[in-house]
Design a protein with these regions (language model features):
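Short catalytic/ligand-binding loop motif for oxyanion handling, primarily in non-cytosolic enzymes
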Residues: 76-80, 118-122, 177-181, 195-197, ...
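A short helix-to-beta-strand connector/capping loop
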Residues: 35-41, 162-164, 194
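Alpha/beta-hydrolase-fold catalytic nucleophile elbow
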Residues: 72, 113, 169, 188
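Core alpha/beta nucleotide-donor-binding catalytic domains of modification enzymes
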Residues: 1-109, 115-139, 157
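Conserved S-adenosyl-L-methionine
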Residues: 116, 163-175
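S-adenosyl-L-methionine-dependent DNA methyltransferase catalytic core
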Residues: 1-12, 155-161, 180, 184-347, ...
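Short alpha-helical segments and helix-capping/turn motifs at coil-helix boundaries
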Residues: 53-55, 95-97, 169-174, 283-286
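Short alpha-helix
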Residues: 144-160
Length: 431
């Protein structure tokens, strides 16, 4: 469902597959305008009904000649924000449709983007209330966290003639210069047994002077995070497209200061406006959320006007516009979206941040160049089928709210309303 494809690393995108008509119209429109490769073949179809051989025939390629297969199966099945249906949801099986194309095309590399929950998803999801620590029976093998990715990696490794090694990275787009806090899983596989490394973060501080920053043990200096102001501060739209809040919702949001959320409302208004959600123990940070220009934007959702996932402009009482979405995702300024308003928001909100796609594309391009220089000789030492690396993916801006005021802290539990850079570590956690 992303509508912008890797423009980096010297790749030519020769084919794309998309099910949704409006999304395909967006691709066609930008293709006709010369923003995409002139030889791009567009397949408007469900990937489960598409023959890999048909794709090869249309592009004039043979198995093994494709440098990179990139894609992202629907993520709702694995999202920690959803019901974690995993492969019990038919959409979860699209993971194996993706594997079908890998097996048929035999690309040198593949890149899969998904929600971070994919890395911990179970083949058979058991509700938390029924798990062993709640008195339930021990988990079966297919109920264990991570069983989806283990089986997928195992099946990848068994592909005849070119078993794939896969490196799984949990990253945050904000750490690479995107003006958005967006945690994602990036799966990079190759048929040469090469162990691929993802770059260390380049950004990591909400201050303007990198010279002042010594957060990491090696005292490497990071650039400041890109902020919402960097993304949309100069935007002046004459006729914006906006999926706006209702008058009732605007009444509550008008009481919330920039950078705050439901906690800034009087308690009686919290209860009135949130209903049963007010007594929930988690997942409430998006309720009546008003953004701030001074920090990166939270993760974009497909509908910014929901009460529980509000994306309200910092100073105007309205939802973010479509083009503000596009700026935050760093689409080119001349990019065009097609379809109904809801469909256009879905395209922008579901897309991989352009900057993150470029970083991943550059990583793969460098590996392809290195392998070409050694005549595509595979790595003689065979690594494990897969590994998972967490590259400082969980980022906190250290904001909290009390009695209608917004605070930041240096250490959790410190109630002083003073600003401090977040504590962060450079070391990657490997499993």
């Amino acid at each position: 469902t992303g509508v912008y494809v890797l423009p980096s690393g010297g790749f030519r995108v020769v084919a794309c597959v998309e099910k949704e008509h409006a999304f395909c119209e967006t691709i066609r429109t930008n293709h006709r305008a010369g923003r995409l490769d002139p030889d791009l073949k567009i397949f408007e179809t469900d990937v489960s009904g598409l023959s890999p051989e048909k794709l090869l025939e249309a592009t004039g390629l043979k198995p093994g000649e494709v440098d990179l297969l990139a894609g992202g199966p629907p993520c709702q099945s694995f999202s920690t924000a959803g019901k974690r249906a995993a492969t019990q949801d038919p959409r979860g099986t699209l993971l194996w449709q993706y594997l079908r194309f890998i097996e048929a095309l035999q690309p040198k590399f593949f890149l899969m983007e998904n929600v971070r929950g994919l890395l911990s998803a179970a083949l058979n999801h058991r509700p938390i209330a029924d798990r062993p620590d709640k008195g339930g029976s021990p988990l079966e093998h297919d109920e264990e966290p991570g069983s989806v990715i283990r089986l997928f990696a195992s099946d990848l490794h068994k592909i005849a003639g070119c078993g794939y090694h896969m490196d799984c990275f949990e990253v945050n787009a904000v750490n690479y210069g995107a003006p958005q806090l967006r945690e994602r899983a990036l799966l990079i596989g190759n048929r040469f047994n090469s162990v691929v490394n993802f770059p260390d973060p380049t950004h990591g501080a909400p201050i303007s002077e990198p010279a002042e920053l010594t957060l990491f043990p090696d005292e490497t200096k990071l650039l400041p995070w890109a902020t919402l102001r960097d993304a949309i501060g100069d935007l002046n739209e004459k006729d914006p497209i906006v999926m706006d809040f209702s008058p009732r919702k605007k009444g509550y949001l008008a009481l919330v200061p920039p950078g705050s959320n439901w906690r800034s409302l009087p308690v009686d208004v919290q209860k009135e406006s949130m209903g049963k959600a007010w007594i929930a123990k988690g997942g409430r940070s998006g309720w009546w959320r008003r953004l701030t220009f001074d920090l990166p934007c939270p993760t974009l959702v497909t509908m910014p006007n929901h009460a529980s996932t509000s994306l309200c402009h910092p100073v105007e009482c309205r939802a973010l516009t479509l083009w503000e979405y596009a700026r935050i995702q760093e689409f080119p300024n001349d990019w065009q979206f097609c379809g109904k308003t809801m469909e256009q928001y879905a395209q922008a909100g579901n897309a991989v941040p352009v900057r993150l796609g470029r970083v991943a594309g550059d990583v793969i391009a460098a590996e392809l160049d290195r392998l070409k220089d050694r005549d595509w000789a595979p790595n003689p030492s065979k690594p494990e089928a897969y590994r998972i690396v967490y590259v400082q993916s969980h980022v906190r801006t250290r904001q909290w709210f009390k009695d209608g005021e917004t605070f930041v802290w240096e250490e959790e539990g410190d109630d002083q309303p003073t600003y401090a850079a977040p504590k962060t570590k450079r070391r990657s956690k490997r499993i």
